[in-house]
Amino acid sequence: MLDVNAFDKIRIGLATADDIRGWSHGEVKKPETINYRTLKPEKDGLFGEQIFGPTRDWECACGKYKRVRFKGIVCERCGVEVTRSRVRRERMGHIELAAPVTHIWFFKGVPSRLGYLLNVTPKDLERVIYFASYMVTEVNEDERHNDLPGLQDEFDSEIKRLEQRRDSDIEARAKKVEEDLAALEEAGEAKGPARTKLRNGAERDMAAIRTRYNDQIARVDAVFDKFKKLKPGDMVDDVDLWREMQDRYGDYFDGCMGAEAIKKRLQSLDLETISKELREEIKDASEQRKTKALKRLKVVNAFLTTGNKPEAMVLDVIPVIPPDLRPMVQLDGGRFATSDLNDLYRRVINRNNRLKRLIELGAPEIMLNNEKRMLQEAVDSLFDNGRRGRPVTGASNRPLKSLSDMLKGKQGRFRQNLLGKRVDYSGRSVIVVGPSLRMHQCGLPKPMALELFKPFVIKRLVDLNYAQNMKSAKRLVDRGDAEVWGVLEEVISEHPVLLNRAPTLHRLGIQAFEPILVEGKAIHLPPLACAAFNADFDGDQMAVHLPLSAEAQAEARSLMMASDNILKPADGHTVTMPSQDMILGLYYLSTVLEGVKGQGRVFSSLEEAEMALDRHEIDMQAKVLIRLPESFVLPKNWEPGEVKVLDPREGEDEVVKEERFHDGTVLFATSYGRILFNETLPTDYPFVNEQVAKGRLSKIVDDIAMRYSTQQVAATLDALKDLGFTRAPWSGVSFAFSDVNEPPERDEKIAEYEAKADKVNANYEMGLLTEEARRQELIDLWTECTAEVSKEVEEKFDPTSNLAIIVQSGARGNMMQINQIAGMRGLVANPKGEIIPRPVKSNYRDGLSVLEYFISQHGARKGLADTALRTAESGYLTRRLVDVSQDVIVREEDCGTKAGLPIRVAERDNDGNLVLVKAADGGPYSRLLAADVIDPADGQTVLYKRDDALSMDVLNDLVAHGVEEVKCRSVLTCESKRGVCAKCYGWSLATNKLVDVGETVGIVAAQSIGEPGTQLTLRSFHSGGVAAASDITQGLPRVTELFEARTPKGEAPITEFAGSIKIVENDRGRQIILTPDADSGAPKEDGVIKPITYQVSKRVPLKVADGDHIKVGTQLVEGSVDPKKILTILGKRAAQVNIVEEVHTVYRSQGVDIHDKHIEVIVHQMTRRVTIIDSGDTDLLPGELVDNARFREINRNIVKNGGRPAVGRPALMGITKASLATDSWLSAASFQETTRVLTEAALSEKVDDLKGLKENVIIGKLIPAGTGLARYRNAVVEPDKAIRDTIYPNFGLGGDGDLGDASFSDADLSDLNFSNLEFGDLKLGDDFNPDDFYSDQGGQPDIEE
C-alpha cells in the first residue's frame, strides 16, 4: 500500500497507451458482467476474477485453492490469483481499441485544446473526428516538387485529350444529324416540324456531351489544383474528389478520416517551430490575431515544457476502473442494480468487438467508418456523457452517469467523498437545556456514551478483571450490567468529546466539552454555549464526535474547550453572553426601588445584611448601607452620597451618609441584590452599582474578557448564569394579555389622520396631485401617525409592570412588538418590497380586519421565502470565500516589511472635540504599528514604538494625546511569499494575543464574513424615486458584487485626470464636462487637451458643483464606484481600501460587527496576481496571470543576469476566478468547473505542492496548519500539576491534588500516562482485531520526523 506521508507533491499528466497497459491486470474482451445462474463473474468480462482478483478472500474462482496459506499462487485451472478480495478496489483492466479515438475533454472543451494545437476550428475538427471529412496527414513535398513538371505535362495532355474527345464526339453527332436530315430529304418527309425536332434533339445531345466532358475537365482541373496546393491539415469534404485525388496522386500524400487522422497529424507536429512562429506573430500582428496566437502558444508551450506527447490525447487503449468502484448489487426481487459505468463500458466493448470482426471480414470502408464513428461516440459518453449530442439514457430516460459526472458537482467524488467524509465514533441526538452544567460540560445520554466509549469500556473491564477476555466483556456491555456503568463513568472522566451543530457557519460550531452521564436520550447543552452554536431547544439536533488519540484529546482540551472559546473570532466580542431568563434574574437583582422595606438601614457587615434579608426585615431591592472591607474595589469616580431612611426610629436621622473610615473600610450604599450580583464578578473588579440590563451586562462581560484570563472569565460567566437562573423565579415575573393597555387617545389620533388622508385623496381626485405624489404623501402621513401612536403607547406604558421589566431588561421582545400589540401595525410592504399606502390601523390586541390580515400576509410569506433564498445565497458566498482564502495561513512571525496602511483613530464630534472613531473595534484595534507614533504636542516624544499592539487602552491614550491617524501593519501590505505573517495580521480576535504561526486566518476570515450573511437583506432598496436614480444594490447582493469585482449596477463615474468641472443640463440628461489641467497628462489632439464628457442621470445627486477644481479619481455623483476603474486610475492600494470600506459599510448598516482585517485577507487574495503586459526576457507570456511573489522573484533573477525584466499591471480578480486560478489544481478542481480544470492541469502536467488545506484533506494528510505544522507536530507535551490546576474545571478549587490517596505525590504524575485510555498502535475500523488487546500496548509513541 501507498504510505500517505511518503510524498509532498502530486502531479497530473496525460497517460500514454503504455501507461494504461502498465496499470492494467488484463484485457477486458467481453461485455458480460456476471453469470445470471451461478452469479459468478464471467471470464474476460467486466467483473472477471482473472483480471481484477478474487471475489472472496484467499479463494480462487474454481475453489481449488482456499485459505491464506496459498497466498500469491495463481490457480492453473481458472487463472485467478489467491489474495484478498479488496484488490478488486485497486486493480484496473483495459480495452484494446480496434481504432483510435480522441479524448472528448481535449477536443470538446472550451477552448478546444486539439483545435488550438492543430490550428483547426472546433467545427472542422468535429467533422473529421466523426467521419464527415477527410484530413490530409502528410504530403511528400520534395517528391511532388520534383515530379510536378511531369505531372503538369500529364495533366495538360489529359485535358487536351478530353477536349479532343469532346470535340470529336460533338463533330460525330453533328455529322450524324446532317446524315439524318439528308435521309429525310430523300424520303420526302423534310417538312418544317420534323427538321426542327431532329435539330433540337441533336443540339440537346451535343450540349450534354459538352457538359459531360467539361465536368470531367473541371474535375481533373480541380483535383490537380487541389493537389498542387495540398498541405498537411487540409480538409476535403467531397468524397469523390478525395477518391479521385487518391487514385491519381496517392503516392505523394496520405490522409484519412476520424481520430486516426488527428493522431497522425499530432505525431508529425514540430512544436519548436510552431512556438517560434507564434512568438513572431505576437510581436507584429493585429490585436485579434495576437490574442489567438497567445492562446495557441499557451497550449504549445504546455507540451514543450512538460514533455507530454500530443498524440496521448488520442487513445488506442481505454482503462477500465476496478469493479468494486462500479459495483453490481442483487436486489430483493432477484433483479440487479448496477452502476451506470458498466452500461457505458458494455457499449464500448460491444462496438469495439463488432469493429474488430468487420476489419477481419474485410468490410467496405463505409461500414468501417460508421462503426468507428459509433465507437468514438461510445467512448465519448463513457468519459463525459452529454457533452456532445444527446446523452445516452438508461431506463426511464435518465442520462447515464459518466466518469466526468462521478467527479463533478456536490455529489461528485471530490465534494461528496474526499472533502466530506462520514466519521466513525460519532452519534447525534436532540438537545435539551442543561442549566446546572458548567460551561465546559455537556450531558451525554448513557446509551450513547456506552456505544461511543465501547472499546475503552471493554478494555477497562478486562483490566479490572470483571471479564476474562474481550468476548465476555462485550457480553457484559451488551447486557448493561451494573459494573459497566461504573467503568463507563471512570472511562469518560477527563475525556473530552466534540459537539457540532449543523450548519457549522464558523469555527465555534464545533466545540469540546467534558461529558457528564445523564438519563434519557437527549444531549444536555449548557445554556451559555447556545449563542456560539446558534442553537435553541425547539427540536435542534447535535452531533457528538469522540477524539480517540492522545494528541486529538490534548488538542480538544487545550484549544477547543467551550470555556476557552469565549470571544468571537469575527469581532473580538464575547459570544457567551447570559440571555433571556438569566438577564431577567440579574436585572431583577440589580434593580433598586424607592420606598421599599428596609431602605436606609445600616449594616456592619455583609453577613448582618444577609441575616436581615433572611428575617424579611429588608427587601432585596432596597437601598441599604453596608460597611465593606478595605479590599473592596469602589466604582470609578465614586463620591460619598446619602440615602433617605424609609421609617426612621425615634432619635435616628432621616438621611444616612456614605463615608470612608480611617481603617480603609467603606460605608457603601447599595442593595443586597447588587451585592449578590457583584459577588459573581472577579474580586478585584470595580463594584457595579447600577441597574444591569442586557446592554450594560454585555459591556461588563466584554470588559472582563479583556482584563482577565479565560479561566476567570469562564468562572464569572458560570456564576452569572447560576445567579440569573436562581433569582429569575424570585422576581415573580409573569404577564397576561391584559398587561398590555391601549392608550385612550389612539382612536382619536387615527381618526385625525384619516381626515388628513381623505383630504389628500380629494386633492388627487381634483387633479391637484399626481399618482406618485399622492402615494408619497399618504406614506408620509401614515408613517407619522404610527410614530405618534407609538409615542402614546410608550408614554402610557407602566415602567414597573412585568412586561416593562421583560422588555427593558432585554430578556425578550422590544417596544416595536409592544406597539404592534397595543398601538397600530402601521404600513406594510407588498411582495415587490414597495410600501402599500393603506395602513393596518388595528393592533394585535383588538385583532385585524380581513383586508388588514390579508395585506399583512405578504410580509410574513416574503419573510420566509427571503430567508430560504438568503440562506442558500449566503452559503454559496461562504463557500467561495473559503475556497479563495483557504491557503492563507500565518506562515512566519515577521515578513520585515516597512509598508503599512494609514488608519484613522480619532474624529471630531459636534463640539469639535477629538473622540475615538466609531468603528475603532473593527478598524485600528488589534493591529500592530508599522511606524513609531510621535506625540503631536512636541513632535519628538515617541508615544508608541513600531510593532506595538493597538489595544483599546492604547487607542484611548492616542486620542488623549491628539493623534488622529497612525500607520498600521496590514495583511494588504504583507510581503510573505505565501500566506501572511503574524505581525502584519496582528492579534487574533479570539484570544486578544498576537496570532500564532499556523493559524488559518483565511478560513477564519471567510467564516467571519459568511456567517452573518443570512442576516443581510437580499433586496435592493427602493428609495421611492426621490433620493437616487436607480435602486442602489445593498445587503448580500452588494457584498457578492464587491467580492466578485463586478461593475456595480448604477455605476458612479470617477475622473481620470485633475481639472475643472462644468455641469450642463439638456433634454437627454445631465453632462459633467471635465477640462483636464495642462500638467495632468491628459491626451492632446493637435496640441490641445480635449475636454472629457460624463453623461449622468438628472435624478442622481451630484457630489461636485459647477466650477469646482477636482483631483484625480474624484467621484462625480452618488452611487457605487467600479473597483476596476479605481485600480486603473488610482492604483492597487486605493482599490483594495475601497473594497474593504464598502464591504464594511454593508455589514455595519445591518448592525453586524466584523473586523476589517478579515475583509483585507479576502481582498489580499483578490489582488495577489499580476497580468503580464510585456514578457521582457522571461518565459512568461503576455496576458498571463502570475502571482506577485513569483513575478518579483522571476524579475529579480532576470535583472541579476543582465536581462530585461517583465512588465505587468496589478489584476483585480473576483473570488470565483481567483479560486480557479489558484496554483493548486486539486483545490481548483474540487471547487467548480472540474473537467476544465483537470483538462488544463493534465496538459500542463501541473504539480500540486500540497501547501493549502483542501489539497491535504483530499489526499488524507494532516493539514499544514495549527498543530499539523511540523513545529507543533513534533513537540511532546506533558502537563505538570501547576498547569492542570489552572484548567478551568479545577480553577480556584485547589486542583485535583486530593485524589483520595494519602501516599500520592507530584512524582506520581509522571506515571500517569493514561495508557488505559489508549490503544497504542491499534487503529479502529475495518481491521479491528481482538488479539491486539491481550497485551497492554502502552502509550502512543511520539511522532518523529
UniProtKB/Swiss-Prot annotation:
UniProt keywords (A-Z) are: DNA-directed RNA polymerase, Magnesium, Metal-binding, Nucleotidyltransferase, Transcription, Transferase, Zinc
Where, by residue number, does Zn(2+) 2 bind?
895, 974, 981, 984
Q: What is the recorded name of this protein?
A: DNA-directed RNA polymerase subunit beta'
Which leading EC class covers this enzyme?
A: transferase
Which cofactor does this sequence's record say it needs? Mg(2+); Zn(2+)
Q: Which domain of life is it from?
A: Bacteria
Give start-end of the signal peptide: none
Output the Pfam families linked to this UniProt entry.
RNA_pol_Rpb1_1 (PF04997), RNA_pol_Rpb1_2 (PF00623), RNA_pol_Rpb1_3 (PF04983), RNA_pol_Rpb1_4 (PF05000), RNA_pol_Rpb1_5 (PF04998)
Quote the InterPro entries the UniProt record gives: DNA-dir_RpoC_beta_prime, DNA-dir_RpoC_beta_prime_bact, RNA_pol_asu, RNA_pol_N, RNA_pol_Rpb1_1, RNA_pol_Rpb1_3, RNA_pol_Rpb1_3_sf, RNA_pol_Rpb1_4
From the UniProt record, list the coiled-coil ranges: none
Gene Ontology MF annotations: DNA binding; DNA-directed RNA polymerase activity; magnesium ion binding; zinc ion binding
Q: Which positions are annotated as binding Zn(2+) 1?
A: 60, 62, 75, 78
UniProt remark on cofactor binding: Binds 1 Mg(2+) ion per subunit.
Listed under subunit, the entry gives:
The RNAP catalytic core consists of 2 alpha, 1 beta, 1 beta' and 1 omega subunit. When a sigma factor is associated with the core the holoenzyme is formed, which can initiate transcription.
Q: Which reaction does it catalyse?
A: RNA(n) + a ribonucleoside 5'-triphosphate = RNA(n+1) + diphosphate
Q: What is its EC number?
A: 2.7.7.6
One Gene Ontology CC term in the entry: DNA-directed RNA polymerase complex
**Biological process, per Gene Ontology:** DNA-templated transcription
The UniProt family comment states: Belongs to the RNA polymerase beta' chain family.
Per UniProt, where does Mg(2+) bind? Answer: 536, 538, 540
What organism does the record attribute this protein to?
Bifidobacterium longum (strain NCC 2705)
Entry function: DNA-dependent RNA polymerase catalyzes the transcription of DNA into RNA using the four ribonucleoside triphosphates as substrates.
